[in-house]
Amino acid sequence: MQRRIFLKNGTLAIAGLVLTRQLSAMTAAEPQTYYFKDDGNIPNSQFPLLVYKNVFSHRGQKGGDWLEQRFAENGWTNTWRWGVYPFHHYHSTSHEVLGCFSGEAVLQLGGESGKKMKVQAGDIIVIPAGVGHKCITHSSDFTVLGAYPFDLSPDLMKGEKGERPAADSRIAKLKLPDTDPLTGTMSGLTKIWKK
């Protein structure tokens, strides 16, 4: 009987420690910020793109499930699982979050003159409406979970002639999210994205 109680209490203590470490890592996570200027084709944004590096440990299906639950808890829904388009594009009807739960890739962020960045499982990227993104190269297992605030659906803009100024107008009218997809109301975009 004593051994059973000891094992039960020990298991609960370990589970509590793991959960505490995961939560403290998420709340302590400070995103990297990247600003991109309008390049004439891709509008980009006054708000920075946010990159959380290696902020969750789940991989594969469990990682996708964890991200979907975490994002939904923080009001980011309408999810999908796939890769990133191999051409420059942006969204004018919603902000977007991408959580990588499998593989790795090199993305170009901010349009033709933007930044090339390696992303891998464990990384989360919060993309303001208007910011260009494209996949340059990826591993065969590269997969992200995408989601949007307010259950919005994104359009697909490619920086082509005739998209603007209508796309700029839609972006300007978008409400800022109430929560960060990873940290909720504690930090992240709620502290960084200010009008």
Predicted regions and their residues:
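N-terminal twin-arginine translocation
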Residues: 1-5, 15-29
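Non-heme Fe(II)/2-oxoglutarate
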Residues: 30-56, 60
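Conserved short histidine dyad/triad with adjacent acidic residue
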Residues: 72-91
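Short, conserved beta-strand element in jelly-roll/cupin
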Residues: 93-106
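Conserved metal-binding segment of the jelly-roll/cupin
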Residues: 119-138
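Double-stranded beta-helix
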Residues: 136-195
